[in-house]
Amino acid sequence: MIEVTKPRAIALGYFDGVHLGHRALMQKAVERAKQIGGTSAVFTFDVHPDSVVMGRQVPLLTANAYRRDEIKLLGGVDEVIFGHFDERMQHMDWRDFIHKMLIGQFHAGWIISGRNNRFGYKGLGNAEGMAVECEKAGIGYDCIEDIKVYGIEVSSTYIRQLIAQGDMEGAAKFLGHPYTVTGIVEHGRRVGTSVLKVPTVNLRLPSEMALPPYGVYATRVLVDGKSYIAATNIGVKPTFVDGGAPTIEPHLLDFSGDLYGKMIHVELHKFLRPEMQFESVEALKNAIDENIRQTRDLFAEE
């Protein structure tokens, strides 16, 4: 257990997808924790604030079930603190958020936020106000400037736009890693194995996830500490199924075995073609063969 009496260097943000900007915040938290002899932490919320404030679901880059693990893995912080964002939190004065919550409840000895971070009721808290209040409290504060790629500010909103366009290469540049879908392998209808002779594993896409366009992608699948390239379909399989919830179905190349019940991570590297309804099973098989060839060629270049 982490000693709660130690001061924390706390990075603030929602940390959806853990992009390059998030990493800069967490790197500074790790650095400051060592400086103050404390622990590094992320403070985030259990739900996206806009889902409460605006009353609409925000498509996420990381499913809620896996956010803690991804933040710790990619950020290197000691702990992740999830605050419950409800109407009480929404109406909390920004000074109370700093003094009563971050300092009083979570023993912040240093706070790190981004230049555009807004917090407290109506988003009235900002970097300038944070600096003043931290100085009053006798704790440290760092404001991390925007991270830009090709002159464009790195943000979860912009990354969602790239994913919606199927630009996996662009999304990876802003994330600092491939866009990844994580889940537990389920039993499917076995169409890939029995009809197409191309066995696949089946994941149900979490409803809160940002969806890329339906189609076939060149992917890499990570499972049990090993990596396999795969041609992966995302969508509703219109050739065989009339409607239904979207699924993600990787066909792992050069792999044989049963992954049912295992957690896998599917990295989406490149959009190959849109999902479509084929006139025959043979036409679909030919398209899959071409997608497998494209996938092998892509990863052979690495």
Region roles according to the model:
Residues 188-302:
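Phosphate/ribose-recognition catalytic cores of enzymes acting on nucleotide-derived substrates
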Residues 19, 71, 111, 171, ...:
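Residue-level signal for inorganic ion chemistry
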Residues 42, 82, 143-144:
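A structural preference for short, hydrophobic beta-strand core positions in alpha/beta folds
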Residues 134-236:
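Glycine-rich, Lys/Arg-enriched anion-binding loops that position phosphate/diphosphate groups
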Residues 1, 87-90, 147-152:
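A short acidic, often aromatic-flanked loop/helix-cap motif at beta-alpha or helix-coil junctions
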Residues 2-63:
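N-terminal catalytic cores of NTP/NDP-binding nucleotidyl/phosphoryl-transfer enzymes
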